[in-house]
């Protein structure tokens, strides 16, 4: 009944209009992680990188102040030191994989001289130094290019098994084999020659050595030359039949002991010392000795009575 006599205004005020009770609701706890530092990549962990980051940021944000003084009045060395102190360029920290040593940048080495800022006019020493550095870099790069080009053009030779062949060693081996082949051919040629040809060749070489000491002028009455011509044997010499002072050519004979024979002929120098006869020479000498002994005994008996 009471609710039936309630006006519409009271009903709306009761259901929808509420007074502020002064109580605040508790904030719902955050279920996410809030990043307090903007350094997501972790650059601030390393002192060197964080220092560089802050300095570069400060340099970028700082206003550029240009003094009224002229660059000519300022010392170049002082400017360089100022720039090094402000920039504080970090050391190269790139490392090769698997190595603890720091690998320096090739670009930094090659362009180190050009990276130095130049202000105003350059002195003669600075221009000379810069030109010399550029010339050294160009020579170094050209030498590297020539070496790489030579290696790329070098032909690789391989044998049937696929093994690489060194041309220098192969040429040396070929020269050695050719020399051995020539030596063998010369030795075979000497063996094929006769004894007379070998002796004549040796005599010719000996004569050449002797001619080095003789005087240059030789005349027809030279006694040594005449003696040499007289001792030379000729096949059509008419006096060869009645000459008595013909020199006897000595032949190489055996120098050791050799058994005697009827004709008193010495064995040659190639004899090996083995007697291959049937013993006839020994029997012949034995018979001759017996005959001489009998004759001597008969003679002694004949004169015994005298």
Swiss-Prot record:
Its main location: cytoplasm. The keyword rRNA-binding does not apply. It is found in: Cytoplasm; Nucleus. Keywords: Coiled coil, Cytoplasm, mRNA processing, mRNA splicing, Nucleus, Spliceosome. Residues 130-198 form a coiled coil. The keyword Coiled coil applies. Belongs to the CWC26 family. This is Pre-mRNA-splicing factor cwf26. The gene is cwf26.
């Amino acid at each position: 009944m009471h609710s039936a006599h309630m006006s519409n205004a009271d009903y709306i005020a009761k259901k929808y209009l509420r007074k502020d009770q002064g109580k605040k609701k508790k904030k719902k706890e955050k279920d996410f992680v809030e990043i307090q530092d903007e350094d997501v990549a972790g650059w601030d962990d390393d002192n060197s990188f964080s220092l560089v980051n802050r300095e570069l940021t400060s340099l970028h944000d700082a206003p550029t102040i240009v003094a009224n003084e002229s660059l000519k009045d300022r010392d170049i060395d002082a400017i360089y030191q100022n720039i090094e102190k402000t920039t504080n360029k970090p050391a190269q920290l790139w490392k090769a994989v698997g190595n603890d040593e720091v690998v320096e940048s090739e670009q930094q080495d090659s362009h180190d001289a050009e990276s130095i800022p130049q202000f105003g006019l350059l002195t003669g020493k600075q221009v000379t130094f810069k030109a010399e550095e550029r010339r050294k870099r160009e020579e170094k790069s050209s030498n590297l290019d020539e070496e790489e080009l030579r290696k790329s053009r070098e032909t690789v030779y391989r044998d049937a098994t696929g093994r690489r062949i060194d041309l220098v060693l192969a040429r040396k081996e070929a020269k050695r084999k050719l020399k051995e082949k020539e030596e063998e051919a010369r030795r075979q040629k000497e063996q094929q020659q006769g004894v007379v040809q070998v002796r004549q060749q040796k005599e010719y070489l000996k004569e050449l050595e002797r001619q080095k000491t003789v005087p240059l002028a030789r005349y027809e009455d030279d006694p040594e030359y005449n003696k040499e011509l007289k001792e030379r044997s000729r096949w059509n010499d008419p006096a060869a039949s009645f000459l008595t002072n013909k020199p006897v050519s000595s032949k190489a004979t055996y120098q050791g002991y050799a058994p005697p024979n009827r004709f008193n002929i010495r064995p040659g120098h190639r004899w090996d010392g083995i007697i291959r006869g049937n013993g006839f020479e020994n029997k012949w000498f034995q018979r001759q000795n017996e005959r001489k002994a009998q004759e001597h005994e008969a003679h002694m008996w004949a004169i015994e009575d005298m």
